[in-house]
């Protein structure tokens, strides 16, 4: 693995940078009412109709038009409450209209849909184009942070950093973030998580050999080491030892200053889950073991996107109380969301991983080997697995919304669903990183 410690010295501790070029507007408060409708109405309200043209086949002639109006069919009481609570003490719980247009001057022309083709047969929900003004601002700030504050990458990796399109990614996944500063909380953490994955596990010198020690020491940047006066300074100095640890340390510092203690602790535990999944995958790579399909899926429940959607309340400027987060039915919703959206990554990165050195485990590869299927049939079965997980996530979210229709629960469920949808859209549109196999 390359020695990233030569990329620069650690920056001084800095507080959150206030927005300078983009005025942030609080999320609007929209009227709501009590819950009386069925769970199916929850699903309808989660996913307003959005048309995203498929660029693959030549489209039939159609009149030029802007994006269709964002509407929600039906007039159920639950649909209205999903738009946000009102009354004393509920301002922070009021989400922005999930896919509604934000007030402000209209652009001279609508931005065309981003290139990219969805996996045929994949159950998903189209989303509108992320706000281009926010995308540009988040992209500018995160690059400044990566280069100036944490010296994240050498010059030759700049193209890969830009191709990651993390600004578009995070704006699309957090449509209810009240300000760009809130979006930056998620963006820094996402970049730091990917730096650890790339530099410790995969693309940029990663190796399963010694992975446990590297991950444990990096984790202390998130979950601090508490020791004696003699040894603490050495640990503090170690946080600047390489780019992944510098990124974790800085990103977590910003997050802790914005989050509540319980939100910060939630994130620490979710990152421990992620690192445990990295270790399982690394152990299999080291021994050449191909797990059973269920074993692979169990590993992916830990090595997955879970830490990203579960900070939706912090990024949204509110808190899902710890007791509500700990409910078994909420934990099931979160697990299913993470599992479904991680299989999306397996499907879109399939071709990229086949063309990379070494053998990469993903769901189609494991199904092909363990169930003796050809590559195409294994890939199509993986699509079916994703679809069942996605439907299960939505059904579990609907059941929870009906069982516990508290405003923070409903908003959190909306946020997780928005993250799942935005994550798929980023994979679909990121043609720099992903392309589909020729199975259709």
Swiss-Prot record:
<dbReference type="GO" id="GO:0010333">
    <property type="term" value="F:terpene synthase activity"/>
</dbReference>
<dbReference type="InterPro" id="IPR047945">
    <property type="entry name" value="MIB_synthase"/>
</dbReference>
<feature type="binding site">
    <location>
        <position position="349"/>
    </location>
    <ligand>
        <name>Mg(2+)</name>
    </ligand>
</feature>
<feature type="region of interest" description="Disordered">
    <location>
        <begin position="1"/>
        <end position="33"/>
    </location>
</feature>
<dbReference type="GO" id="GO:0042214">
    <property type="term" value="P:terpene metabolic process"/>
</dbReference>
<feature type="compositionally biased region" description="Pro residues">
    <location>
        <begin position="9"/>
        <end position="29"/>
    </location>
</feature>
<comment type="function">
    <text>Catalyzes the cyclization of 2-methylgeranyl diphosphate (2-MeGPP) to 2-methylisoborneol (2-MIB), which likely involves the intermediacy of 2-methyllinalyl diphosphate. Is also able to catalyze the cyclization of geranyl diphosphate (GPP), albeit with much lower efficiency, leading to the formation of a complex mixture of cyclic monoterpenes, consisting of alpha-pinene (6%), beta-pinene (23%), limonene (32%), gamma-terpinene (29%), and delta-terpinene (10%).</text>
</comment>
<dbReference type="Pfam" id="PF19086">
    <property type="entry name" value="Terpene_syn_C_2"/>
</dbReference>
<dbReference type="GO" id="GO:0046872">
    <property type="term" value="F:metal ion binding"/>
</dbReference>
<feature type="binding site">
    <location>
        <position position="202"/>
    </location>
    <ligand>
        <name>Mg(2+)</name>
    </ligand>
</feature>
<protein>
    <recommendedName>
        <fullName>2-methylisoborneol synthase</fullName>
        <ecNumber>4.2.3.118</ecNumber>
    </recommendedName>
</protein>
<dbReference type="InterPro" id="IPR008949">
    <property type="entry name" value="Isoprenoid_synthase_dom_sf"/>
</dbReference>
<feature type="binding site">
    <location>
        <position position="345"/>
    </location>
    <ligand>
        <name>Mg(2+)</name>
    </ligand>
</feature>
<feature type="compositionally biased region" description="Pro residues">
    <location>
        <begin position="50"/>
        <end position="63"/>
    </location>
</feature>
<comment type="similarity">
    <text>Belongs to the terpene synthase family. 2-methylisoborneol synthase subfamily.</text>
</comment>
<feature type="binding site">
    <location>
        <position position="197"/>
    </location>
    <ligand>
        <name>Mg(2+)</name>
    </ligand>
</feature>
<dbReference type="InterPro" id="IPR034686">
    <property type="entry name" value="Terpene_cyclase-like_2"/>
</dbReference>
<feature type="binding site">
    <location>
        <position position="198"/>
    </location>
    <ligand>
        <name>Mg(2+)</name>
    </ligand>
</feature>
<feature type="region of interest" description="Disordered">
    <location>
        <begin position="46"/>
        <end position="74"/>
    </location>
</feature>
<keyword id="KW-0479">Metal-binding</keyword>
<feature type="binding site">
    <location>
        <position position="353"/>
    </location>
    <ligand>
        <name>Mg(2+)</name>
    </ligand>
</feature>
<keyword id="KW-0460">Magnesium</keyword>
<keyword id="KW-0456">Lyase</keyword>
């Amino acid at each position: 693995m390359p020695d990233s410690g030569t990329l620069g010295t650690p920056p001084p501790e800095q507080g959150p940078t206030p927005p300078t070029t983009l005025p942030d507007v609080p999320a609007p408060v929209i009227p709501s009412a009590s819950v009386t409708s069925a769970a199916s109405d929850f699903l309808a309200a989660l996913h307003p109709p959005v048309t995203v043209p498929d660029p693959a086949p030549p489209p039939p002639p159609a009149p030029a038009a802007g994006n269709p109006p964002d509407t929600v069919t039906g007039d159920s009481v639950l649909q209205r409450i999903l738009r946000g609570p009102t009354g004393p003490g509920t301002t922070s719980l009021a989400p922005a209209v999930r896919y509604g247009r934000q007030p402000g001057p209209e652009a001279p022309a609508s931005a065309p849909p981003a290139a990219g083709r969805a996996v045929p047969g994949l159950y998903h929900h189209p989303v509108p184009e992320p706000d281009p003004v926010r995308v540009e601002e988040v992209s500018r700030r995160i690059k400044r942070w990566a280069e100036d504050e944490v010296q994240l990458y050498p010059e030759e990796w700049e193209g890969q950093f830009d191709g990651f399109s993390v600004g578009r990614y995070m704006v699309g996944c957090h449509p209810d973030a009240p300000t760009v500063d809130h979006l930056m909380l998620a963006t820094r953490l996402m970049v730091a998580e990917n730096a650890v994955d790339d530099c410790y596990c995969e693309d940029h010198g990663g190796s399963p050999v010694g992975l446990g020690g590297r991950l444990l020491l990096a984790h202390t940047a998130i979950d601090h080491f508490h020791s004696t006066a003699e040894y603490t300074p050495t640990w503090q100095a170690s946080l600047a030892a390489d780019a992944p640890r510098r990124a974790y340390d800085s990103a977590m510092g910003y997050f802790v200053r914005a989050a509540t203690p319980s939100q910060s602790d939630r994130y620490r535990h979710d990152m421990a889950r992620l690192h445990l999944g990295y270790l399982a995958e690394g152990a299999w790579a080291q021994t050449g073991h191909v797990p059973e399909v269920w074993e692979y899926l169990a590993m992916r429940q830990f090595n997955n996107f879970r830490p990203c959607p579960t900070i939706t309340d912090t990024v949204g400027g509110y808190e899902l109380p710890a007791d509500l987060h700990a409910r078994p039915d909420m934990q099931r919703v979160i697990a299913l969301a993470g599992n479904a959206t991680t299989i999306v990554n397996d499907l879109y990165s399939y071709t990229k991983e086949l063309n990379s050195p070494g053998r990469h485990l993903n769901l189609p590869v494991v199904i092909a080997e363990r169930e003796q299927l050809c590559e195409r049939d294994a890939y199509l079965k993986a699509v079916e697995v994703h679809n069942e997980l996605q439907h299960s996530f939505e059904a579990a979210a609907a059941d929870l919304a009906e069982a516990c229709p508290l405003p923070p629960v409903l908003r959190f469920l909306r946020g997780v669903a928005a993250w799942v949808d935005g994550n798929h859209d980023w994979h679909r549109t990121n043609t720099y990183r992903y392309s589909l196999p020729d199975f259709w």
